[in-house]
Amino acid sequence: MYFFVYLLLSKVKDRYISYVGYTNNIENRINLHNSSKGAKFTKGKKWVPIYQKRYKTKSEAMREEFKLKNDRKKRTLIKLKYLKHL
């Protein structure tokens, strides 16, 4: 079983917001975020996955999720790379 760290993007009014998480079922988790059953922060928004990375263990994924959540520069670079291609 693999674990994934992912970055989601949503446009709210005139700006973009992001959400970082980890899971062992990426498709199901994104569907949950886009439904009313996702995390409290993600409810009611349309989320697009813009980054995901696979890890062999849950602890690796959790460590990388923590790093990505706290590395605003890296998140911004990922967002800019995605938005450049729109």
Task: Describe the predicted segments one by one.
Residues M1-Q52, M62-K69, K73-T76, L80-L86:
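GIY-YIG nuclease catalytic motif and its immediate N-terminal context
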Residues Y55:
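Short, surface-exposed polybasic/aromatic micro-patch for ligand or macromolecular engagement
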Residues K58:
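C2H2-type zinc-finger recognition helix
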